Structure formats: C-alpha cells, structure tokens
Design a protein with these regions (language model features):
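Alpha-helical linker/hinge and terminal dimerization helices associated
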Residues: 28, 32-35, 69, 112, ...
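N-terminal helix-turn-helix DNA-binding core of bacterial DNA-binding proteins
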Residues: 26, 30-72, 86, 154-159
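Base-recognition residues in the alpha-helical recognition helix of bacterial helix-turn-helix
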Residues: 19, 48-51, 77-79
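Residues within helix-turn-helix
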Residues: 62-63, 74, 81, 101
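N-terminal leader segment of winged-helix/HTH proteins
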Residues: 1-40
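C-terminal regulatory/oligomerization modules of transcriptional regulators
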Residues: 1-11, 133-159
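Charged, amphipathic alpha-helical coiled-coil/dimerization segments
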Residues: 2-6, 81-141
Length: 159
C-alpha cells in the first residue's frame, strides 16, 4: 500500500496532496533507478554525484559534494572511490591544503554522464507524458508557489 492509499477522506486536502506528491516522487524515482541500473549498470547516487561534477568542471571538494548531495561524507567517499576505480572521476590535490582534494569528471566520465543525462531527460519527459504542456506549466507554477512559501517559512524560523 502506498502512502497516498493510507490517507482517509477525513484528512485535510493539504495532507492528501502531500501524500500524492510523495507517491508520485517515489514512483518516478523508482523508474529512474531501474532504468539507470538496467541501461547503465549504475545507481542514482552515482548519477547524482556525476551530475554535481558536470556542473563544476574544475571539480569540487569532498565536503562541498557532500553538502550539495545532502549526504554524509562517508557516502560521497564510497561513491567517489568506486568512480575513481572505474576511471570516471579523478582526485586532484587542493593547492595549499595537503589534506584535501577536489574530485572532477574524467573525459570518459563526462562522456558517460552526457549519455546518461540524455536518457534521464527522456525518462522524466515520459513520466509526465500523461499531462498536456499547459497542465505541466500550471503544475510547475503551483509547485513554485509551494516552494516559495516553504522557503519563506524556513527562513523566518531560522532568523
């Protein structure tokens, strides 16, 4: 039984919407994970790490990668070790800090990431194929309002 099915009709609409969003996210993410595994023999965390590095051609320090991916340093180290072994990323010493290094995509890693990213885009487009362009725009706009409100609430709480 998915999260949404557990909500009863007496629950507020906002709660039922939240559960629907979670369910949709879980279903789409599961599909993406399955496709990455079957087509590229990789995982979503590896794809995410490579995606972060693609956006930073000079590479990123491990702590910055960890922060951007919202995972522990140990997780980033484990994934990085695998990708280094496969020749998809490389470690580079950080000038002025003998204990730190940056990680960046190798040319081979960049080529593979571009292939995966194109497929990823296709999978996401397919996930929303049941909606018209207008519906996608409306949903994007509405979720933008939710995002802005949530962000503002969070900022108000941390002041």
């Amino acid at each position: 039984m998915d999260l949404e099915a557990r909500a009863h009709s007496e629950h507020p609409e906002a709660l039922r919407l939240w559960l629907r969003l979670l369910t949709c996210t879980q279903l789409i993410e599961k599909q993406v994970r399955n496709e990455l595994r079957s087509q590229f023999a990789t995982t979503l965390p590896r794809f995410d790490l490579m995606s972060q590095l693609e956006r930073s051609p000079d590479g990123l320090k491990m702590n910055e990668l960890s922060r951007r991916m919202m995972v522990t340093g140990g997780n980033v180290t484990g994934i990085t070790d695998q990708l280094v072994t496969e020749g998809l990323v490389e470690r580079i010493n950080v000038e002025g800090d003998r204990r730190a290094w940056r990680v960046r995509l190798t040319p081979r890693g960049r080529k593979l990431f571009h292939e995966m990213a194109q497929q990823h885009e296709d999978w996401i487009v397919e996930a929303f194929a049941g909606l018209s362009g207008k519906e996608i725009s409306q949903l994007h706009k509405l979720l933008g309002k939710v995002k802005e409100h949530s962000h503002n609430q969070l900022m108000a709480e941390t002041e």
